[in-house]
């Protein structure tokens, strides 16, 4: 997985979030969860599952004739690598540019400012 780019579509993130939440989920479980929030057809959702499987983000095991899907990547790892790819593309690898952009444009609460200070002081 380390050699692959961590490119996941917004729709694929929704599938991954369900799999991370449930640990193991059948296609029908995933379909039910997504259809509570989205008006997507079962075929569309199965296509997303297949894409994630082919990309190597998830795997499956058969349990009583039903495939149970599970993640092959840690949620925190993929979020970090996806964020890093984004920073490299948009900010040319300049993490400080990203942070400065958000700090300057966002209204931060005192708690958020204090949390940022604490994180920076630990570095």
From Swiss-Prot:
Report what the Swiss-Prot or TrEMBL entry states about this protein's PTMs: Upon exposure to beta-lactams, proteolytic cleavage at a single site impairs dimerization and abolishes repressor activity.
Q: What is its main location?
A: cytoplasm
Q: Which GO terms describe its molecular function?
A: DNA binding
Keywords in UniProt for this one? Antibiotic resistance, Cytoplasm, DNA-binding, Repressor, Transcription, Transcription regulation
Q: Does the keyword Nucleotide-binding apply?
A: no
Site location (Cleavage): 101-102
Which cellular compartments is it found in? Cytoplasm
Oligomeric and partner information: Monomer and homodimer.
* Similarity comment: Belongs to the BlaI transcriptional regulatory family.
Protein name according to UniProt: Methicillin resistance regulatory protein MecI
Q: Which organism is it from?
A: Mammaliicoccus sciuri
